Amino acid sequence: MSSLGDPAVLPDGGAWSAWLDDAERIGLVTPAGRDLALPHSLAMAEALVRALPSLSSRQDPGGDRSSSEGTLPAGPRKRVVDLGSGAGLPGLVIAAVLPETEVILVEASIRRAEFLASWSGELGLGERVKVWNGRAETLGRDPAHRGRAMAVSARGFGQPAVVAECAAPLLSIGGVLVVSDPPAAVDAGDLDPLPWDEARWPSDSLSGLGLEALARQSTPFSLSVIAKVRTTPDRYPRRVGVPAKRPLFGTAPPDSR
């Protein structure tokens, strides 16, 4: 699966270049970030693939199996939810390199949602990619989506507490959250996997959402992988906007009023 790190694995490279051109033109990708956009997304896809085999034997030690959240869904396509998809990073890339998946791109902005819908078709992914134009908190309350995802990806979606609270209800037991972190401050000689960043992703707080730390890597990009091991309490996610205003852990952003 190491070949996933090479953008050459993407079909029809010209179409992907045109997609990035359009994303840069309307300000969804910066010129400085463009060159890293595809490699970063491919690294997240690879982290997802590496994590899932190790989860196949996980059991829910105390979760309520009668709840709306079950084990990983059976069937030829596994659901991946990309939070705050923006230009489609990494959601569109995951859909392209993992053809057994269906990918839901969550985007609150109408303009960005229209961009995603248009380009998912242009890239030949329209059948397997759906765009949710709304808030992640709302999606997590929808019985058609709660507890149905094999994986959730998040790149630049929000603070860790917001990501965890919005992702946990969407995941099936045994699923994983793959999230992009700020670059890790490590020496070049240090090896992956890195020790878990307890300050950024406190284990006790994750446990309250039914989550558990799984892996952390610094190369080629800083990523954390978090497993769903038990049912998320029904009270999560809280109302739209509350996870950011009153985070379950960490520090709330300054009030901009």
Where are each of the predicted segments found?
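Glycine-rich, flexible loop segments associated with nucleotide phosphate handling
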Residues: L72-V80, R148-M150
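Conserved class I S-adenosyl-L-methionine
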Residues: R58, P76-G86
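Glycine-centered tight-turn and secondary-structure capping sites
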Residues: G86-I94
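Gly/Ala-rich phosphate-binding loop of Rossmann-like dinucleotide-binding domains
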Residues: A95-P99
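A generic alpha-helix surface/boundary motif
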Residues: S17-A18, G88, R200
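S-adenosylmethionine
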Residues: G91, T101-E102, A108-R257
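Class I SAM-dependent transferase core
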Residues: M1-G75, R111-R112, S118-G124
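Conserved beta-strand segments that form the floor/walls of ligand-binding pockets within enzyme
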Residues: D82, V93, I104
